[in-house]
Curated annotation (Swiss-Prot):
Positions of post-translational Phosphoserine modification: 12
Pathway(s) the chain acts in: Protein modification; protein ubiquitination
InterPro entries named in the record: CULT, Lon_prtase_N, Lon_prtase_N_sf, PUA-like_sf, Yippee/Mis18/Cereblon
Region (Disordered): 1-30
Name the record gives this protein: Protein cereblon
Binding, Zn(2+): 310, 313, 378, 381
Key words of the record: Cytoplasm, Membrane, Metal-binding, Nucleus, Phosphoprotein, Ubl conjugation, Ubl conjugation pathway, Zinc
Lineage summary: Eukaryota, Metazoa, Chordata, Craniata, Vertebrata
GO MF annotation list: metal ion binding
The organism of origin for this protein: Pongo abelii
Quaternary structure note: Component of a DCX (DDB1-CUL4-X-box) protein ligase complex, at least composed of CRBN, CUL4A, DDB1 and RBX1. Interacts directly with DDB1. Interacts with KCNT1. Interacts with ILF2. Interacts with TRAF6 and ECSIT.
């Protein structure tokens, strides 16, 4: 069964395979109220509720060399902090995971820019934090929830006699840059500086006014240089995070600052994991070793790449950035695994176009409990784009939305916004 074969209901009849053009999206509107429990998708309840959970974490020293086993069937560019659900059937993989559970529970996920690529240069360590074994018709199945930990550079790949790949990797460090004003400020006064936390809301007028004054004073030392204040703000982590948060609030109006990481490194990875970009751009983000540089690149992508097209057709627009909304605590996009073991990073949008629906709605193995899914294909090339989700109860909101798989989407710059062609996207690196 191919990796891109969509999940279909178990009882498929000939009449269920009918292909119809979707008409609902033409009248679709952004839901004003969402009463869906956004914690359900992140818990991956479709894997089962009785998974054995592990605590603690395994972190390797920066620049250290490690030998880590590789899960070969995971064709995904994992971002640190991103959750990776897995269903493993092959005896080799089942045996490998069992051994990992007895050790440090860490395996390597290699970052391939495409399926044809034979050797990966970068990747991410993944640590198992939930585990379950079961049997289905005599076949042993392992269900796993893992989380990305650290970036690495691949030094060597070798295959053992049992067929398991071992990767010798170098753990990549995170470069923490000093404040943009550090070069012109007196070091003796650094300990006297006050960095107030940003107020959660504007209701606390006193704190908010103090915050505004702090923001104005933040770059006052720029007057001592030949460069303007705004130039320094372009490389200030706090300023970059605020600009990205404004973009994220367009996807989730109820987004709260305390639900996002306050650390620039963790925040940059959180944003990278929910950006609907192709593998080429994602590997570029994974290679970057500085949170500030990563944030600048992410903000550039969010501002420029406002259209999402079919990756196969390249010119057939499926949706736009304005249609994205969040239905999960992780944000508008997260990774889910289907019963065949294939992982789909799925983006939620409330409107999509140029799609045909295949078959009838099914609630089997639904990633969003309470919603039935229908396979969606590109109207032009018939490639699998994702699913249409429809509510099974009338009191649920939203009543319908789309889940688009990231691997089928190509981020592009609309011609009206930029003269560059999609294959000449210049990112702020």
């Amino acid at each position: 069964m191919g990796n891109h074969l969509p999940l279909l209901p178990a009882e498929s009849e000939e009449e269920d395979e009918m292909e119809v053009e979707d008409q609902d999206s033409k009248e679709a509107k952004k839901p004003n109220i969402i009463n869906f429990d956004t914690s359900l998708p992140t818990s991956h309840t479709y894997l089962g509720a009785d998974m054995e959970e592990f605590h603690g974490r395994t972190l390797h020293d920066d620049d250290s060399c490690q030998v880590i086993p590789v899960l070969p069937q995971v064709m995904m560019i994992l971002i640190p902090g991103q959750t990776l659900p897995l269903q493993l059937f092959h005896p080799q993989e089942v045996s490998m995971v069992r051994n990992l559970i007895q050790k440090d529970r860490t395996f390597a996920v290699l970052a391939y820019s495409n399926i044809q690529e034979r050797e990966a240069q970068f990747g991410t360590t993944a640590e198992i934090y939930a585990y379950r074994e079961e049997q289905d018709f005599g076949i042993e199945i392992v269900k796993v929830k893992a989380i990305g930990r650290q970036r690495f550079k691949v030094l060597e790949l070798r295959t053992q006699s049992d067929g398991i790949q071992q990767a010798k990797v170098q753990i990549l460090p995170e470069c923490v840059l000093p404040s943009t004003m550090s070069a012109v400020q007196l070091e003796s006064l650094n300990k006297c500086q006050i960095f107030p936390p940003k107020p959660v809301s504007r209701e606390d007028q006193c704190s908010y006014k103090w915050w505004q004054k702090y923001q104005k004073r933040k770059f006052h030392c720029a007057n001592l240089t030949s460069w303007p204040r705004w130039l320094y703000s372009l490389y200030d982590a706090e300023t970059l995070m605020d600009r990205i948060k404004k973009q994220l609030r367009e996807w989730d109006e109820n987004l709260k600052d305390d639900s996002l990481p306050s650390n620039p490194i963790d925040f940059s990875y959180r944003v990278a994991a929910c950006l609907p970009i192709d593998d080429v751009l994602r590997i570029q983000l994974l290679k970057i070793g500085s949170a500030i540089q990563r944030l600048r690149c992410e903000l550039d992508i969010m501002n420029k790449c406002t259209s999402l097209c079919c990756k196969q057709c390249q010119e057939t627009e499926i949706t736009t950035k304005n249609e994205i909304f969040s239905l999960s605590l992780c944000g508008p996009m997260a990774a889910y695994v289907n019963p065949h073991g294939y992982v789909h990073e799925t983006l939620t949008v409330y409107k999509a176009c140029n799609l045909n629906l295949i078959g009838r709605p099914s609630t089997e193995h639904s990633w969003f409990p309470g919603y039935a899914w229908t396979v969606a294909q590109c109207k032009i090339c018939a490639s699998h784009i994702g699913w249409k989700f429809t509510a099974t109860k009338k009191d649920m909101s939203p009543q319908k939305f789309w889940g688009l798989t990231r691997s089928a989407l190509l981020p592009t710059i609309p011609d009206t916004e930029d003269e560059l062609s999609p294959d000449k996207v210049i990112l702020c690196l």
